């Protein structure tokens, strides 16, 4: 209307092809990340079996196990007891990272604490293999236990630690530095 010349430059076939290839690669990468192995390790702390309340403590533990099983069913995982107070859940990264499932996990943790006065510490690990995911979950659980608070930490396949989940301020940092100067210093020591 103002007399300016307008020129329409349609994208070339090559640019369209490159854009579609890039989109396809991004989708494949995201799908691969969500298909990674995930392991969650639940550990009951502050759990004391008293002789005078032997049966009531067994019933409380059974109620907690039911809740953990319901959570595991919701994420379509598999659960295994490991010792008296530890449970290992195998799933995929997509299910574990989903915000809805993380809220369910936080609610489970809160419910166990309020109803049974038992802390439920959780370590989550993801990785290319179940072994790598479990090692990451163990490290995350150790960090949770070290803080002596009821918290959830997660270590991903890239060795980045996230947490505590569900808190207003969540930290995210690399456990292994990629800085060449720091790597050189660590090799010398």
Show where each model-derived region lies:
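Interdomain helical linkers/hinges and coiled-coil/dimerization scaffolds
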Residues: 1-84, 157, 161-189
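Two-component system phosphotransfer/interaction surface
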Residues: 16-24, 134-145
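Catalytic strand-loop-helix junctions within cyclic-nucleotide turnover domains
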Residues: 47, 92-99, 118-136
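Short amphipathic alpha-helical segments
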Residues: 56, 60-64, 100-104, 133
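Short beta-strand->loop micro-motif that forms the acidic, two-metal-ion catalytic signature
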Residues: 79-97
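Generic beta-strand/beta-sheet core signal
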Residues: 82, 90, 123-125, 155
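GGDEF/GGEEF active-site signature
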Residues: 91-115
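Catalytic/regulatory signature loops of cyclic-dinucleotide turnover enzymes
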Residues: 111-121, 136-180, 184
